[in-house]
């Protein structure tokens, strides 16, 4: 950003205090100048770090900076003015600014008691699903994991916009932010957004951040920052959702990725999901998208609606299988889920065959088994079923054996993910 910090704040560096001019917020917002600066470069230029390192923890006023940023940001009406006054670039920069200004073990839930929990929830998810999450101490992570925000569809935000955030220790009714342990969800090969499905239900309240196309695009951009791959994604989805197509699609994606996809389709393409369109195959866009799309969709027999959470490499062998479509889960109830579990997950022979299939594949002339299946142990194929709210099935498989290799062999990781998905889909189609 071209805006420097001292153009937005009147502050004294020596004392480490920041005083925001009372009239500054309206002026900034009306001029499209929300407090979004390249703080890192600015601080480096001004040589504000005693040790010479660009560690924001050395600045005693950084917590106040965050508070002021959030305060000024919320001085505008987020549901009516945000698209007129704040660009997508600025909104994303705000997330970066806040994550950059998070000193280890100093960020507290209390500092997020702003007027609207709407964007706060998004920001908190951003904190938890990018590389900055390592600077948040474990105690805070446990608080964030169950951070009770407004249920933006039915909660107090609709009745009282000035309502404070619910107390995480008291109120368990309004949780829309969920944190997933340890490893990033690689939806499309990118860090995903972890939120309760209610966050993505559309059209039920005027206050939803996803009520307009601009913010839907902003969400998409935050998920897929690469311009070319984002265009590829939109073009592919556009082809799949053509109402004139007669194919029945499947959806195999990370659990809440389905909700994001539904939101994006509704807002960006301005059409509703029909029953026929709800079977969409959310494939790994990193590799082989066109070839696999053609191969999969010429099949006439539709595949059961199923979403898969966890790391992409586990798309065929388990991790967490989430029947996230609530209506279908209720309709088919426990009998349906048990059948899915027995047919898809607990079929030991299927996974034994899959293991052999994986071992026989090569990537760049290298045997995959040599690179990534070194510690693979068939004896650890243990399947443990757990229900959550009557609609989730968790499977404990070989998860930890793959995690150590996940980032070390990124390209092989994606390739193997595709191989697993190919095999998995073919097995399901042939049943």
UniProtKB/Swiss-Prot annotation:
CDD domains: BTB_POZ_ZBTB_KLHL-like. This is Uncharacterized protein L909. It comes from Acanthamoeba polyphaga mimivirus (APMV). The lineage of its organism: Viruses, Varidnaviria, Bamfordvirae, Nucleocytoviricota, Megaviricetes.
């Amino acid at each position: 950003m071209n805006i420097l910090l001292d153009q937005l704040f009147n502050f004294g560096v020596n004392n480490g205090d920041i005083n925001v001019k009372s009239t500054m917020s309206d002026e900034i917002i009306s001029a499209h100048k929300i407090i979004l600066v390249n703080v890192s470069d600015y601080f480096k230029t001004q040589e504000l770090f005693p040790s010479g390192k660009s560690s924001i923890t050395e600045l005693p006023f950084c917590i106040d900076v965050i508070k002021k940023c959030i305060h000024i940001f919320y001085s505008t009406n987020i549901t009516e003015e945000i698209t007129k006054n704040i660009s997508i670039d600025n909104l994303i920069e705000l997330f970066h600014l806040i994550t950059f200004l998070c000193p280890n073990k100093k960020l507290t839930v209390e500092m997020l008691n702003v007027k609207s929990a709407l964007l706060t929830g998004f920001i908190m998810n951003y904190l938890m699903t990018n590389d900055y999450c390592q600077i948040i101490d474990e105690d805070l992570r446990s608080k964030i994991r169950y951070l009770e925000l407004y249920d933006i569809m039915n909660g107090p935000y609709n009745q009282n916009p000035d309502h404070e955030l619910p107390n995480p220790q008291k109120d368990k009714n309004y949780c829309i932010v969920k944190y997933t342990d340890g490893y990033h969800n690689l939806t499309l090969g990118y860090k995903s957004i972890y939120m309760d499905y209610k966050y993505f239900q559309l059209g039920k309240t005027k206050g939803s951040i996803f009520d307009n196309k601009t913010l839907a695009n902003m969400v998409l951009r935050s998920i897929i920052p690469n311009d070319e791959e984002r265009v590829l994604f939109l073009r592919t989805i556009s082809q799949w959702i053509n109402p004139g197509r007669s194919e029945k699609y499947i959806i195999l994606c990370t659990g809440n990725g389905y909700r994001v996809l539904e939101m994006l389709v509704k807002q960006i393409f301005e059409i509703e999901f029909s029953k026929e369109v709800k079977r969409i195959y959310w494939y790994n866009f990193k590799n082989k998208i066109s070839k696999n799309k053609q191969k999969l969709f010429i099949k006439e027999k539709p595949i059961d609606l199923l979403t898969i959470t966890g790391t992409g490499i586990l798309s065929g062998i388990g991790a967490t299988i989430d029947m996230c479509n609530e209506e279908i889960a209720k309709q088919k109830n426990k009998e349906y889920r048990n059948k899915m579990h027995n047919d898809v997950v607990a079929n030991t022979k299927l996974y034994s065959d899959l293991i052999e299939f994986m071992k026989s594949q090569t990537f760049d002339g290298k045997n995959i088994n040599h690179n990534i299946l070194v510690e693979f142990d068939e004896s650890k194929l243990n399947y443990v079923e757990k229900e959550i709210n009557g609609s989730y099935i968790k499977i404990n498989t070989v998860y930890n054996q793959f995690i150590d290799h996940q980032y070390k062999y990124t390209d092989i990781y994606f390739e193997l993910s595709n191989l697993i998905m190919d095999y998995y889909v073919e097995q399901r189609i042939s049943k």
